[in-house]
C-alpha cells in the first residue's frame, strides 16, 4: 500500500484511463483500461487495477492463468510484485505531478525484477519527460495533456538524435 511521509506527501493517484495510448510512434486504442477499486472485477477482458487490489488478486486463486495490469504509484513497494511478475501483462506507472520523479525509479526497479511486459506512464505525462521515460523502459503513454497530445499527433517526437550530456 502506498504510504506518505512528512518529506514525501502522497499525491492523488491516477484512476481514470484515457481512450487511447501513445506507443510505437502513434496513438492506438487503449486496450487496458483502469478499473476502479469500487468496480466489480470482470470475468473476462483486460484491466489494470490498483496496487493493493492487484496484490490481493495475485495472492488468491481468482485469476487462474489470467494476466492483469497494475498501477504502481510513487510510494508503492515494487519488490512486492516480484513473486507475481510473470502474471502481469501491463504495469502502469503513475506520475501524479510533474515534479515527482519517483516514477522513473519505479520503472528501473521493475526492470530489475525482470518484468518483460508493457510499461506504461499514466498521470501527468508531459512532452519533455517522454524521452527520459523511454530511457528507463517505459514504452507506452496515456497522454491527457493537450499540448503534449498536439506535439505527438503532429509527429514531433521528443527524442533528440544526439546526447551531449546523458541523464
Feature locations, PLM:
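A positional/architectural concept
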Residues: 31-64
Amino acid at each position: 500500500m502506498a504510504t506518505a511521509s512528512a518529506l514525501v506527501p502522497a499525491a492523488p493517484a491516477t484512476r481514470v484511463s484515457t481512450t487511447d495510448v501513445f506507443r510505437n510512434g502513434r496513438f492506438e486504442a487503449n486496450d487496458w483500461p483502469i478499473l476502479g477499486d469500487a468496480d466489480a472485477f470482470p470475468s473476462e477482458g483486460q484491466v489494470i487495477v490498483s496496487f493493493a487490489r492487484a496484490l490481493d488478486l495475485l495472492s488468491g486463486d481468482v485469476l487462474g492463468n489470467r494476466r492483469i495490469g497494475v498501477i504502481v504509484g510513487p510510494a508503492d513497494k515494487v519488490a512486492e510484485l516480484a513473486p507475481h511478475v510473470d502474471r502481469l501483462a501491463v504495469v502502469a506507472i503513475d506520475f501524479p505531478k510533474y515534479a515527482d520523479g519517483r516514477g522513473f525509479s519505479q520503472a528501473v526497479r521493475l526492470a530489475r525484477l525482470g518484468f518483460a511486459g508493457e510499461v506504461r506512464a499514466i498521470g501527468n505525462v508531459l512532452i519533455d519527460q517522454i524521452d527520459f521515460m523511454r530511457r528507463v523502459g517505459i514504452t507506452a503513454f496515456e497522454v491527457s495533456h493537450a499540448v503534449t497530445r498536439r506535439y505527438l499527433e503532429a509527429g514531433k517526437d521528443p527524442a533528440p538524435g544526439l546526447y551531449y550530456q546523458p541523464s
